[in-house]
Amino acid sequence: ILIRHGETDWNRELRFQGQVDVPLNATGHEQARRLAQRLAQEAVVAHHLVSSDLVRTRQTAQPVLGALLPQLHIDNLTDPDLREQNFGLVDGMRVQDIKDQHPDAWARWLCFAPDSGMPGGETTQQFHARVIGALQRLAQQHAGQTLVVVTHGGVLDMVWRTAQGLGLSGPRQSDIPNAALNRVRLRPGAIDILHWADTRHLQGLPAQPVYDQTRLQGAGGAPPADR
């Protein structure tokens, strides 16, 4: 079970969050609470819960762990390899500021080249190798078990691309809402998508910022609200 963290203020402020430690906002906490409630109501069976070590994932994981503990003795582990992509010098910056202060880097970013990244940050290839390697490692360590993994939008994008056999170039092609349920099966050398972007438990909450990479290349560019 893969979960993207709940909403933060930086999602709303349209910043590259990257690996900056940003906490959940009030909506994000409510998303996490509803997610935990749904897992408890569905009596989801899980053996381990793993999150990235950033605060927004740990805060999302906390109520989820509480919902699962009455059923099973599971532990809460953190793994820094599940962090969001490192955007280097632009971590924490608004898109307009990146365009103004790093125009060449921004132009390269809009090409979505796998071997390119923001100054001082990871390339998409490096990011993909890190996060898919981490998930395959966890799957091998806990073979035959169900894991709940709380991570980031960019990580889930890499999972989707891998499962669908897509390359790393080009804009994102999947919806990755905050605190949605995504169910996958990891096999040696492959990932199967079972269910994706299930947000039934979030009905009635404010509309989420949408990370539409296809609009980034348009006039003005719509900023990435998730990463």
Regions found by a protein language model. Give the residues of each.
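Short, hydrophobic/glycine-enriched beta-strand segments
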Residues: 1-5, 150
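Active-site metal-binding loops of divalent metal-dependent hydrolases
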Residues: 6, 153, 199
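Loop-to-helix element that buttresses phosphate recognition and phosphoryl-transfer chemistry
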Residues: 7-64, 114-132
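Phosphate-coordination/substrate-recognition cap region in phosphate-metabolizing enzymes
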Residues: 34-106, 227
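Acidic, low-complexity terminal tails and accessory targeting/binding regions
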Residues: 45, 66, 87-97, 140, ...
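Alpha-helix capping/helix-boundary segments
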Residues: 56, 155-156
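Short glycine/proline- and acidic residue-enriched helix-loop micro-motifs
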Residues: 105-126, 217-224
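Generic beta-sheet signal
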Residues: 137-138, 145-151
